[in-house]
Regions:
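Cytosolic regulatory regions of ion transport systems
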Residues: 1-390
């Protein structure tokens, strides 16, 4: 049968399977030669086709392996920037998500995805209910932000060490959220600034949507308060770490119309410390403050959602110990500070706010700074002096 359809079919079979040639009728020399040529061409075409397909699959797998694929997530936490502090941040977020199923953390860094995955696994043993996803790319590019589903994130943490990069990233994220009409969504941006001169620029870039933390000022306040109170660091770690109890802002509609003093004992497994009205937190407000619609209760609890107010006031026995009403004034305090850096003025300003007048602060350092004379003045409660010693 020498019909066109049959010849096309036979040519296709010879191109796909070289073994078909062995079953051909060898009485027609021209036919055999033609089919042999078709078979040889088919071998080359098939080899090229297999190579193209394999190369395409390999390229796609490499793209997925290197973290260039789109992340389809919702209500996740995005961390922009990969450095040594990433492990502490992820550990705290894992603890925060421990009472939630399917927690997601997305890390965007300039390193390869494989390197970030390996480093995170080496530093963190138990991920509990949280899955950590890494993506590689330049965070100031909208394509990388789009790949990371930033517009559907619950929170965005900018974890960069350079203030200039932080500000650029804030601008990029804000611009991207606006382009997606998601700027007014619940996602909140948090960033750390190391130089006070960049604070205002970072706040302007965030357009009221970013919480800018001045790192040196925060650490200086912690140091100033913990140096006089043994155990204060443990208290701060307990409050601000997600292990144990922490502060939560929750709305309880059933408390509307009640006075703040009346709700203090309604929570059995948490401690009420204040009210948040709009964006203004009020710690320890007057006892006759009335809870309004939309007010959120600030309370110290083990986890969010575990504490609910009871309907009836519990019976309180008044035969226990009472707080001392008399104010006990602190005595003059002497403090030795070893070393000097840019954080010293911040620490001294914080100490000057609450130390008793006449308290003495001595700073010992290898070499006196140029402004040592002026640095000793300007404090209301501190008598400051310098010692130049190793």
């Amino acid at each position: 049968d020498a019909s066109a359809g049959n010849m096309i079919w036979m040519s296709l079979m010879h191109a796909i399977d070289a073994g078909t040639l062995a079953g051909d009728d060898t009485s027609h020399t021209g036919y055999v030669i033609l089919m042999a040529v078709v078979t040889i061409c088919g071998i080359f075409v098939t080899s090229i086709l297999i190579g193209i397909i394999s190369s395409g699959f390999e390229e796609k797998l490499n793209s997925l392996r290197k973290g260039f694929s789109r992340v389809i997530e919702n209500n996740h936490t995005v961390i922009i920037g990969f450095n040594d502090s990433i492990y502490t941040i992820i550990t705290e977020l894992i603890e925060a998500n421990s009472n939630h199923r399917n927690g997601r953390i997305l890390v965007i860094g300039s390193e390869d995805k494989e390197i970030m995955d390996e480093e995170i696994r080496n530093h963190i043993d138990d991920f509990k209910t949280t899955k950590v996803i890494c993506r590689s790319g330049n965070q100031v590019h909208s394509a990388v932000l789009d790949m990371s589903s930033v517009e559907t994130a619950r929170s965005i943490i900018i974890n960069e060490e350079d203030d200039f990069v932080v500000i650029k990233t804030i601008l990029s994220v804000v611009s991207y959220l606006k382009s997606k009409n998601a700027f007014e969504n619940k996602a909140y941006i948090t960033a750390i600034i190391h130089d006070s001169g960049n604070l205002e620029a970072a706040r302007i870039a965030g357009e009221g949507k970013a919480e800018i933390i001045y790192f040196k000022d925060m650490i200086a306040r912690v140091i100033a308060n913990t140096c006089r109170q043994p155990g204060m660091s443990s208290v701060l770690t307990e409050i601000f770490g997600f292990a144990g109890d922490e502060f939560y802002f929750e709305e309880f509609p059933e408390l509307k119309g009640k006075k703040f003093g009346d709700i203090l004992n309604l929570f059995r497994v948490s401690t009420v410390v204040g009210i948040c009205r709009g964006d203004d937190p009020m710690l320890n407000p007057p006892m006759d403050t009335v809870i309004e619609e939309g007010d959120r209760i600030i309370h110290l609890a083990e986890d969010d959602g575990v504490s609910k107010p009871s309907e009836e006031q519990p019976v309180i026995k008044a035969d226990g110990k009472k707080a001392v009403d008399k104010y006990i004034e602190d005595n003059e305090f002497e403090l030795l500070i070893l070393g000097h850096n840019d954080s010293l003025p911040l620490i001294l300003n914080e100490l000057d706010d609450f130390m008793t007048k006449g308290s003495k602060v001595t700073v010992a350092c290898d070499s006196l700074p140029e402004n040592a004379d002026t640095a000793c003045s300007g404090y209301s409660n501190l008598d400051m002096s310098w010692i130049e010693k190793n």
